[in-house]
Amino acid sequence: MYGQVERKRVNFGKITNLDYLPNLIQIQKRSFDWFLQADVKDETKRKHQGLEAVFRETFPIESPNNDMIMEYSHYILGEPKRSPQECKDTDATFAMPLKAVIRLIIKETGEIREQTVYMGDLPVMTEQGTFIINGAERVVVSQLHRSPGIFFSYDMERDVFSARVIPYRGSWLEFEMDNKGILIAKIDRKKKFPATLLIKSLGHGTNEEVLRLFYSSKKEKIAGATSKDLKKILGRRTINDIINMETGEVMLEAGSKVNEDNISILKEMKVKEVELIEFPKGKDNPILINALEKDGVNDYEDAILKFHSLMRQGEPSTIENATTELTRLFFSPKTFDLGEVGRYKINSKFEFNNPKEFSGEKARVLRPADIIETVRYILNLFSETENYYPDDIDHLGNRRIRSVGELISNQLKTGFSRVERVIKERMTVQEIETQTPQLLISIKPITAVINEFFGSSQLSQFMDQTNPLAELTHKRRLNALGPGGLSRDRAGMEVRDVHYSHYGRMCPIETPEGPNIGLILSMSSYARVNDYGFLETPYRTVKNGKVTGQIEHLTADKEEYHYIAQASGVIDEKGELKNKLISTRHRGDFPFRNPSEIQYMDLAPLQVVSVSTALIPFLEHDDANRALMGSNMQRQAVPLLREEAPFVGTGMETRAAYDSRICIVNKHDGVVTSVDAETIVVERKGGKESDTYSLTKFKKTNQGTCFNQKPIVGVVHSEINGKVSKVSKEKIEVTGENGELKEYVLQIGSKQYAPIVSSGEEVKRGTTLAGQVVVGEKLDEMGNILVKGTVLADGPAVDNGVLALGRNVLAAFMPWEGYNFEDAILISERIVRDDVFSSIHIEEFEIQARETKLGPEQITRDIPNLSDKAFRDLDETGVIRIGAEVKPGDILVGMVTPKGETDLTPEYKLLHSIFGEKAKDVRDSSLRMPNGFEGTVIDIKRFSRENQDELPAGVEEMVKVFVARKRKLLVGDKMAGRHGNKGVVARVMAEEDMPYMEDGTPLDIVLNPLGVPSRMNLGQIFETQLGFAASKLGISFETPVFDGAEESDVDNFCKEANLPLNSKFKLYDGRTGLPFMNEVFCGYIYILKLAHLVEDKIHARSTGPYSLVTQQPLGGKAQFGGQRLGEMEVWALEAYGASHTLQELLTIKSDDMLGRARIYEAIVKGIHSIKPGIPESFNVLVQELRGLALDIIITDSEGNTVDISDYEDEYSKSKKKIKFETIENA
């Protein structure tokens, strides 16, 4: 690309700094690296996480009779057998073999049998953060789910608080108040009992012990107390049992209220003082005491036995059984797991901070202290104690991300638990002498769960590959649905709504419209996931009113306690906040605070929104609903034949294209030495090694768009034969054979070229003189980009390393003859002629030759009963040639299938013996071009068993044919801008008839001005105006979101370009040459062509398939279905009195089987009268009513009974008759 000068880019951003932007697909790659730990050199020293944790939690496995034990040492990862591209071509899975070193120890002899056991193939993530499963590229979407831990909630209707202990795995424990005012505990939402029973089962056996756990007490005098003092005691509760020392009788139970009778009894007993409960705020809150009265036990043993009898009804209760059951429920790592996250949440909630106590397996189970603190917290909530609040379950501190690594781990745990069961069974069955790890381990359960997860899980999705942005967004998506998540039907408004804790973590704009709104979200640009799975966002730290250069990432929980200034806060030269009062964010409020009270400041205005939303220029002038549509529609833009970067962008385009990994990025510093359409060679610094980069050419994506890479770096070739006369950093001079001097400059714009030849060297025309200097990519440990590598080749929808989803077109906002009514779009014929919005789409067609019972199918050119014309583009093997133009019905691959052998006549046998195979019974089963498809064959892929290709069982040969088609813009295609301004092409008009400007420039596109005010997306107006200035000045603008160009900036550039400040121009009618009455707003707007192409949707049916039960035509283009005539269409026909049309539509054109047969007969014979019969759906209704035991009798207009079976007989007769007559007439 020598000599090509890039457009100058002007950035309006004052604050936005993309250097701190994390690697945009980091969430996928980091999570998978965490799971696999492939880069750990010593395999025996991997951390207890991911795959290693799955092995460690499964092993060791002890045999049921304790005579042997199986231990795990470490796992080994092999190399994938095929490259990602080979996997796509052969419909294989990109996976690596997983092996584990397993030891079987025989206890009696101490013998150790060690083996490396193959554990199956594990799908591997590609460089792009995707998986290739059965040849298709898939993405595992991160799940947003409720974090494990303890949560307190408030039920407004019942005015009660409840607590819920949610583990990562295991039984749920809940505390709440029932209708009788008793604090109850629930296990797994089934078993219900007083909460105090559980507390007593933990070792606090008596009522007094329980009360002392939760309440403080105060001793009050009775002996010698005045009546005034005694009045204060009345109504208060005792903390301990008051016992008559002489008789041993309990006079007053712990928790009982003191009344006048009690006082007189206590005086008689000569009790000097009583110890009374000090309730918080002095409020008597009896829910715990009511539970004590209800539980009916007063020591540990009774409590734990009663607990066991409730949990295991019908089983004998012993102390041992009861203790085991309680341990199993909450205190055993095998059955209960809070996870690191759950423990972290509990510790931060109750401010536990003893690190020794929370290490290893102990940290992941509940402790008695956790249960006691939970009850204490709920009692404080009921007492309205200060600093005790219920949790907000929609707060991002209580919702976490389960990324790909964690999701695969959870699946493997299921598979490994099944493997454990199989191993234990085999240990008891097989002879101890012959047992080895290989024989004991069955890998089928592991393979099954891996295949199930990647193939059919709700979170493993077919990648949206329409364009690079769609791909990038899919990898950054957060899904609240899926296993263990929410369900679409039950999710309410609260969980879908934008929450203040989403700020900087999840985009408040980008979410689907429809039933999934608010459940499927996108990560904000700067957000990252921490080790616990919580989303963090970066802030600049502020100390004593001065903004430091330090950056800190905060979770939603930590952010709660701080005042955070906006990124747009005014800072002086010293870095101090200027104003006396600064607008801040604090929880859900926006208070003004002194600079000294501020601890953090936003990093960039961009950090609120996702990548898609950050690509919308002048977003601040758009309504949120339209911005949502704009974000979503950019992902549907089809990559065009000729890409063009927007005149008005946001600066995010370069980073989005770079991080999507669809461009080829240079790995090491060096110089480009060779460039062609398929390879780029870069010689590394030092000249000892070189890297060769292969480009992907015209491959089909998941959505059928074209994936093609084009080099954008270059070399300098000599244009003459001669000798190099001078070499310097600035230029190379070559003296030709005839003495002419040719000069080559080595600095063009931002591109620097380095000489490859030396002075005095002989060169020929085409010899490489110099290569472009390129920079290698450098990443940090987290995978973030420290130095961006030079982009060597553009991918689809990328222009010179800049994301280019659409084209800049000259637009006017004016109505034109109603052709842009209701958002329709009028476009110029130039757009179609010059392929401005043309795109390439690729379809794949596949055929398999199988082994059948009657013999093998054969791919051949020798197909019976076809003309020579049908074979014109097939090669000698029966496969179409590359470059052939194909239309519907054309043969792509010729194939014959053997027919069933019939009793052969003597004549046939004679012919067979004379002509051999020709007359043999074969059926044409060739692969033909389906209806509605045409194009050019661009590639053929053949696989056969003879060539040792891996094929599915029973398949002998497989051929794939790729057909490409250039699609020009058509009437009916959907187009859109970046501001949610969408419409359908209504008319393609001759260029000379389009309105034109005073200098004679015809418009490219005419949009309806009425689409702007009501939609409130004024961003398109600013974009159009600035776009015109960019076009005139030959530059591009970057206006970052919430930090972009102001009105004054737009005006200044319009002045510089000699454009009117209101961007209104005098336009002339192309048909008459007369000027329009008013001036019209014009400029350059960036328009996308969306994947909703009219050719994929338009469809017509003559006759086709019918539903088996109702006999009505099927629906949809895929089934070659009919058009539904609904209730409202029936009303319309009734209103017009079109009775015959209506009857025809409801009977013979739909499900009147006899009528259909008769009309066919009538058409064949040329008869024009028809008599409709009974629709088949009526018969279905009758049978359904009979199924409900209703006696249905059908009568005609005269009251005579009609038998439907007669009608069916008539249908079958008429069918035979028609068949016979048709053959006869033929």
UniProtKB/Swiss-Prot annotation:
GO biological process terms held by the UniProt record: DNA-templated transcription
Keyword Transcription: yes
UniProt xrefs under InterPro entries: DNA-dir_RNA_pol_bsu_ext_1_sf, DNA-dir_RNA_pol_bsu_external_1, DNA-dir_RNA_pol_su2, DNA-dir_RNAP_su2_dom, DNA-dir_RNAP_su2_hyb_sf, RNA_pol_bsu_bac, RNA_pol_bsu_CS, RNA_pol_bsu_protrusion
CDD domains per record: RNA_pol_B_RPB2
Its EC number(s): 2.7.7.6
Pfam families referenced in this protein's UniProt entry, alphabetically: RNA_pol_Rpb2_1, RNA_pol_Rpb2_2, RNA_pol_Rpb2_3, RNA_pol_Rpb2_45, RNA_pol_Rpb2_6, RNA_pol_Rpb2_7
Catalytic activity: RNA(n) + a ribonucleoside 5'-triphosphate = RNA(n+1) + diphosphate
One Gene Ontology molecular-function label: DNA binding
Assembly and oligomerization: The RNAP catalytic core consists of 2 alpha, 1 beta, 1 beta' and 1 omega subunit. When a sigma factor is associated with the core the holoenzyme is formed, which can initiate transcription.
Family note: Belongs to the RNA polymerase beta chain family.
HAMAP family listed in its UniProt record: RNApol_bact_RpoB (MF_01321)
Protein name (database record): DNA-directed RNA polymerase subunit beta
Lineage: Bacteria, Pseudomonadati, Spirochaetota, Spirochaetia, Leptospirales
